[in-house]
Amino acid sequence: MTPQDFIAKWGAPGGVPGPAHALNEEQGAQSHFLDLCELLDVPKPGSVEGYHFEEKSNVVGGRTGYADVFMRGVFAWENKAPGKNLDAALRQVLSYSLALSNPPILVVSDRLSIRIHTQFTGHPSRTHEVRIAEMDQPDKLALLRRIWLDPESFKPRETNRDITEAAARSFSTLAEGLRRRVASPGDSPPPPPPPRPPGRPPPDPIPVLLLRRSRGPAAR
């Protein structure tokens, strides 16, 4: 499958929905994923152990859920129909991930965009997004292939500890600056007023009104 074929089938190029665009979530989830695997030339579910559709998972509250696609130790994937809320989809797959041994990559897709969320232990989470209109761009396709072929490349270089230590250093620098200001021997005296231009008389003094207490006739 070529990028143009994929976009024409699953997208709406030029505002014209493709033949698979209107499929609901259940109808389109697996066929979209299989077409994506063919486009990217990556293994399809069932080709290796621990990689398949509909991975059963217990979620909070004792309910049972299913990750649409799961590759053990690599990713859990949740598919939605076009226009569905992908933030809600992420919360859904997060609720499965604990029971699925916390795969480091969580992917959500509404078939019009694919969002890759990383959750490597000890590292900050990062998000990458590829829209269907970008599926003909080699760098975007390479990014998606890395989910299967090089998942560790999504691990951020910085760790949570790096971020905490950097924040602590920044706070320490700020606190030291404030301490030095407080410890300085008083503020510098204000600058003298500018000299009066030559020939200008000094300002008149403010008049003072003296009030005398009235006195009655002198005692005789």
Go through each PLM region and give its residues.
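Short, basic/polar, glycine-containing "phosphate-handling" surface segments that engage DNA
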Residues: 1-16, 59-65, 73-74, 80-205, ...
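Extended, well-ordered alpha-helical scaffold/bundle regions in very large, multi-domain proteins
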Residues: 3, 215-220
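Acidic-basic catalytic patches of nuclease active cores, encompassing PD-(D/E)XK
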Residues: 14-52
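N-terminal, well-ordered alpha-helical segments
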Residues: 30, 34-35, 67, 91-94
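Short alpha-helix boundary/capping elements
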Residues: 33-41, 203-216
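Central hydrophobic cores of alpha-helical transmembrane segments in multi-pass inner-membrane proteins
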Residues: 35-36, 75-77
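Active-site metal-binding core of divalent-cation-utilizing nuclease and nuclease-like domains
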Residues: 43-72
